[in-house]
Amino acid sequence: MGSKFHAFMFPWFGFGHMTAFLHLANKLAEKDHKITFLLPKKARKQLESLNLFPDCIVFQTLTIPSVDGLPDGAETTSDIPISLGSFLASAMDRTRIQVKEAVSVGKPDLIFFDFAHWIPEIAREYGVKSVNFITISAACVAISFVPGRSQDDLGSTPPGYPSSKVLLRGHETNSLSFLSYPFGDGTSFYERIMIGLKNCDVISIRTCQEMEGKFCDFIENQFQRKVLLTGPMLPEPDNSKPLEDQWRQWLSKFDPGSVIYCALGSQIILEKDQFQELCLGMELTGLPFLVAVKPPKGSSTIQEALPKGFEERVKARGVVWGGWVQQPLILAHPSIGCFVSHCGFGSMWEALVNDCQIVFIPHLGEQILNTRLMSEELKVSVEVKREETGWFSKESLSGAVRSVMDRDSELGNWARRNHVKWKESLLRHGLMSGYLNKFVEALEKLVQNINLE
């Protein structure tokens, strides 16, 4: 291996982004590289336990400036509703002087970033290489962000796009309308991401050639930037904290592979009528289920929003829970037979490396594209059908679940076989370490080239 480097990391102030960056930091620190991790003060406490190499990874906190429209003390996406994201982006942009000072003093070799599109400018000023680390699927980047296209072109497939399946259809293109919204000071979300992709030295993506190679090649060709793959970087199971007794005891009442686990991510808050339809769809399956979702809009608790008579009807086999749960440990429990998910990027990988059948109810544009990748390219899952309005019915949900849970179902057996194949491929010995070794070697060469310039 080459000489050791010092990397700065500056992720977006959302915990999904920060934890993905920290997971990569741990992998680099494992190989004795030094990391300075820039983050809001509030986030430090929540992330410290995930820093596995405190001798190599140093947290450097930033003071998040006040911004009109941003609640006092808000520093991360968990402090605000999704509608206030633009104000948080403005706050991030206004840390630029602090970040520049940190780079000046710390003298890193590399800076990893995602939403802070001005990082490449600072990097060039100090002779540092910038790495745009993407924490969404390559397919999503390939269809959404292409040089020479405008925000108005998002409803059509870019020329040369390598898939006829991983697409948005009809009304689904509206799910990308947020890309044209203001996001930070004087820029839209689309412009912010495009500037970062065009100006960075290297693009890196948490994926693997086996799954998304053609999308990565398309991105590399479009941006004329080297695309480095970290591999899937699957999190190691945390065996230090067993599954909470409440869920261990409840799940143990049921036969192996019989329970549906449903979780729609931290961002999704359903309308009350759609929440009730979700509950009724679970009831309609006739199977035991655990649903972990936030209370719907307009409700302060799960209980007040449940359909009339629902709790009494399902009390022996169903739970709807509004709090946090240990998702990886629940998915690993032998009683779980089906995972119903929104198909966020993290949940997508979790689904692939577990044994349960997979059903997706995507909500956002990125999630829809992830779902098409999983259901139509890899053929490991089933997507719940929606109406033109975006509504999904209890019948479409229960039908999708039954189609994968029924042992006599051709669709279920087909998805099961493909899932086993992909799980074995992703978990085969040496795959992840091989990707990581190549990734680190490429970074070391990048740093060596700086020193030769």
Swiss-Prot record:
Binding site for UDP-alpha-D-glucose: 266, 325-327, 342-350, 364-367
Matches recorded under Pfam families: UDPGT
The protein's Enzyme Commission number: 2.4.1.-
Coiled-coil zones: none
Keywords: Glycosyltransferase, Transferase
KW Plastid (keyword) present: no
Top EC class of this enzyme: transferase
InterPro entries hit by this protein: UDP-glycosyltransf_plant (IPR050481), UDP_glucos_trans (IPR002213), UDP_glycos_trans_CS (IPR035595)
Gene Ontology MF terms in the entry: UDP-glucosyltransferase activity
Record's keyword annotation contains Ribosomal protein: no
Family designation: Belongs to the UDP-glycosyltransferase family.
PANTHER family: GLYCOSYLTRANSFERASE, UDP-GLYCOSYLTRANSFERASE 79B6
Protein name: UDP-glycosyltransferase 79B6
Organism: Arabidopsis thaliana
